[in-house]
């Protein structure tokens, strides 16, 4: 097996990323697919690694979807769901504000996720400009998962984003993330999600206003197991067997 990761930049800013965990004989086809994925870039990096140890996750998080009239209502729903699992409104508000304004201390977005203490709201990631990236995750049979999502009524426009985001969220919860809030930094894509072990993966629209270039991820995590969690998110290679 091989881990293949793509990262694209434009004017020094991260604009696209994707990855696969695949048999070696699919390498050429998958690399070509990843090269075509960014719309615009002036730098693209493809990283290919041999996989020595592979773990499996039996099933993905269950998927639900909610559409709201505006961002305010969507964020109120996020606050409500996270409060149900013990995260206070003030902490969730801080996370939402970070993603709305841009979580990078120097302004704008980060390549990785914010790690946030769910009690104090303190940021825990070692590098607040880089964040923590969930990598080395894919589906055992990506084609079958796509077809299953199509049969559930997921439109083609959302399909690639959903299949990647669901894989990341599933690995996050498997590694020990308590809950996640995420939306894209793509100015034209307003759908985001929240995820946890308790309520699964909930797609939410709109999580931000149209034409807004900020976004990212906040992971609520336990301070006590931080290093073990980071190692799991960034280094362990995993495949998800089935869609729940």
From Swiss-Prot:
Disulfide bonds: none
Entry cofactors: Mg(2+)
Catalytic activity as recorded in UniProt: heptanedioate + ATP + CoA = 6-carboxyhexanoyl-CoA + AMP + diphosphate
E.C. number(s) listed in UniProt: 6.2.1.14
Function: Catalyzes the transformation of pimelate into pimeloyl-CoA with concomitant hydrolysis of ATP to AMP.
Quaternary organization: Homodimer.
Protein name according to UniProt: 6-carboxyhexanoate--CoA ligase
Species annotation: Hydrogenobacter thermophilus (strain DSM 6534 / IAM 12695 / TK-6)
High-level lineage: Bacteria, Pseudomonadati, Aquificota, Aquificia, Aquificales
């Amino acid at each position: 097996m091989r881990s293949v990761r793509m990262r694209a930049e434009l004017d020094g800013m991260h604009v696209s990323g994707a990855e696969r965990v695949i048999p070696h004989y699919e390498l050429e086809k998958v690399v070509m697919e990843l090269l075509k994925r960014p719309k615009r870039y002036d730098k693209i990096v493809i990283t290919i690694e041999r996989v020595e140890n592979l773990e499996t996750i039996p099933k993905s998080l269950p998927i639900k979807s909610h559409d709201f009239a505006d961002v305010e209502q969507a964020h109120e729903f996020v606050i409500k769901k996270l409060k149900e699992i013990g995260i206070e409104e003030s902490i969730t508000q801080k996370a939402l504000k970070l993603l709305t304004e841009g979580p990078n201390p120097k302004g704008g977005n980060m390549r990785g996720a914010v790690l946030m203490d769910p009690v104090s709201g303190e940021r825990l990631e070692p590098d607040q400009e880089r964040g923590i990236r969930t990598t080395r995750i894919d589906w055992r049979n990506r084609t079958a998962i796509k077809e299953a999502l199509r049969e559930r009524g997921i439109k083609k426009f959302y399909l690639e984003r959903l299949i990647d985001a669901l894989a990341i969220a599933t690995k996050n919860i498997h590694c020990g993330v308590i809950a996640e809030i995420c939306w894209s930094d793509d100015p034209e894509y307003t759908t985001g999600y929240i995820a946890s072990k308790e309520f699964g993966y909930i797609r939410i629209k709109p999580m931000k206003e149209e034409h807004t270039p900020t976004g990212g991820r906040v992971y609520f995590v336990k301070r006590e197991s931080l290093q073990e969690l980071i190692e799991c998110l960034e280094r362990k290679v995993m495949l998800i067997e089935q869609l729940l």
